[in-house]
């Protein structure tokens, strides 16, 4: 437990009311955006390449697991992780501060392969995994860095300034995403707005942690957004994941996988947010057109 309830640790100091107000305003903003602009909720006639039409960088959640059958590694110390050069560099050399198989509790963490970056991405929840695939498919995303560690010195200063207990271990933010226009946004993925209600057992801990992350990224000139899984279009994420498995033409074995390859490269646009796409049905009767489209696109690259 990174933070204990404030009244038990610092009886003379209450949780910063300004922190509570700011975090709650963020949650309400996320809820308004998803309700009115419908960025992540299901829509009919959804044209995937234009799914993220809003100029801002939207919002999105979490639970935790080690995949069944996957080898669970012994937890490494922060010192060892730093010595390994985690969170340094970009592209296929990047390694997040926490790996999926280093999670101490049973949940839904998984390591997914990013065919664009050419590396494994470690997601610590189903929500993080779904969020990753949606962001990966966006045209304006340049770089995705998961489990980005925070400077312990900066975190300590923030905690001291606000009377928060200083965490023993180094903190990390779920995602730091760099966009093609050069802007960067840090995302914290949470299960839903219920976690931010006073009745939630996680209420105090979550508010403090989110405020620390908010203040941290603010000091580095980076926007910070809370992402709620309840606003995430899980169907869209699943369809994107199915197609991205065939991003590399070496995995293409027939007309159905040819179509998935074309969708992964956005050479073909199909509705993917309403229901799980039945590619076999789409292929039936269109085999010749799909083969020709695949040949033209693949040969032209």
Please place each PLM-identified region on the residue numbering:
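Helix-turn-helix DNA-binding segment
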Residues: 1
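Electrostatic, structured charged patches in enzyme active sites and in nucleic-acid/phosphate-binding
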Residues: 7-10, 16, 20-301
């Amino acid at each position: 437990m990174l933070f204990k309830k404030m009244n038990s640790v610092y009886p003379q100091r209450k949780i910063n009311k300004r922190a509570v107000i700011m975090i709650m305003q963020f949650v309400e903003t996320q809820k308004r955006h998803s309700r009115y602009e419908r960025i992540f909720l299901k829509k009919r006639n959804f044209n995937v390449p234009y799914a993220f039409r809003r100029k801002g960088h939207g919002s999105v959640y979490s639970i935790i697991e080690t995949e069944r059958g996957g080898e669970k590694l012994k937890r490494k110390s922060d010192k060892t992780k730093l010595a390994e050069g985690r969170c340094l560099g970009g592209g296929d050399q990047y390694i997040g501060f926490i790996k999926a198989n280093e999670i101490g509790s049973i949940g839904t963490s998984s390591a997914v392969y990013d065919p664009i970056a050419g590396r494994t991405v470690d997601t610590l929840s189903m929500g993080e995994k779904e969020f990753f695939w949606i962001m990966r498919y966006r045209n304006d995303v340049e770089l995705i860095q998961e489990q980005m560690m925070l400077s312990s010195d900066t975190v300590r200063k923030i905690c001291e300034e606000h009377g928060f207990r200083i965490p023993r271990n180094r903190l990390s933010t779920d995602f730091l995403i760099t966009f093609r226009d050069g802007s960067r946004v840090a995302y914290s993925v949470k299960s839903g707005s219920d976690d931010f209600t006073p009745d939630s057992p996680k209420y105090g801990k979550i508010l403090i942690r989110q405020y620390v992350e908010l203040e941290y990224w603010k000091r580095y000139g980076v926007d910070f957004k809370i992402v709620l899984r309840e606003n995430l279009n899980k169907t869209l994420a699943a369809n994107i994941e199915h197609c991205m498995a065939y991003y590399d033409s070496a995995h293409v074995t027939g007309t159905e996988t040819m179509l998935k390859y074309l969708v992964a490269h956005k050479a073909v646009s199909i509705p993917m947010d309403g229901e799980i796409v039945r590619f076999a049905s789409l292929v039936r009767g269109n085999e010749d057109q799909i083969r020709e489209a695949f040949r033209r696109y693949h040969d032209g690259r």
